[in-house]
Regions:
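Bacterial Sec-dependent N-terminal signal peptides
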Residues: 1-13
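Low-complexity, Ser/Thr/Pro/Gly-enriched N-terminal "stalk/linker" regions
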Residues: 10-124, 151-173
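Mobile, glycine-rich extracellular loop/lid and propeptide segments
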Residues: 128-141, 156, 160
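Residue-level signature for tetratricopeptide repeat
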Residues: 83, 140, 144-147
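Residue-level marker of positions within ordered structural domains that often coincide
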Residues: 3-6, 81, 142
């Protein structure tokens, strides 16, 4: 919604009522879901008996997760980029660069090539790497590069596209 408003008008929407709602949600997620090591939890409140039933292939994981999976964590990047783009408020740039991106780097798998983000922080072992998760992050890096002109963000987007293109196949259904 904020992106549409900003795109249509060509201006920031700092005073739009949805901005304060989005800002409040962002603050609450950062405050309620944060972990000591700069990540976010998968759920709030943390339930020690939680069963994760939405894993690939119908697998189920029992017990407490130490952090969120990549997909919900990367949504924080999308939100911060969108809020920065919509408002121009450097608060979102600071949150992104000081909290979200450092946490996101804990998912970076540089051991398996081409490098990309894996589905769970690397310090907890090897986990799945998914093209769809990485494409959303690559798009966010492209948007953020466009806003900041910082070459590191473009380089990260290109690295992610190298991973994504590595999965290309001309086989039907492949």
């Amino acid at each position: 919604m904020l992106f549409c408003l900003a795109s249509a008008s060509g201006k920031t929407v700092k005073n739009h009522p949805f901005v304060s709602i989005a800002d409040s949600i962002l603050d609450n997620v950062l405050n309620l879901y944060q972990t000591e090591d700069g990540l976010l939890t998968e759920t709030y409140p943390v339930n020690p008996d939680q069963k994760i039933t939405y894993l690939a292939g119908g697998a189920q994981q029992n017990g407490t997760l130490k952090a969120s999976f990549l997909w919900p964590y990367s949504g924080m990047m999308s939100g911060c980029v969108a809020m920065y783009q919509a408002t121009g408020d450097k608060k979102y740039k600071t949150i992104l660069e000081k909290r979200i991106l450092p946490g996101l780097e804990q998912y970076w798998d540089g051991e398996r090539l081409p490098a990309c983000y894996q589905s769970y922080p690397v310090k907890y072992g090897q986990h799945g790497r998914y093209y769809d998760d990485n494409i959303w992050i690559a798009l966010d890096y492209c948007d953020y590069y466009r806003l900041t002109k910082k070459a590191d963000y473009l380089k990260k987007a290109i690295a992610l596209y190298e991973y994504i293109y590595s999965g290309w196949s001309d086989e039907l259904g492949g």
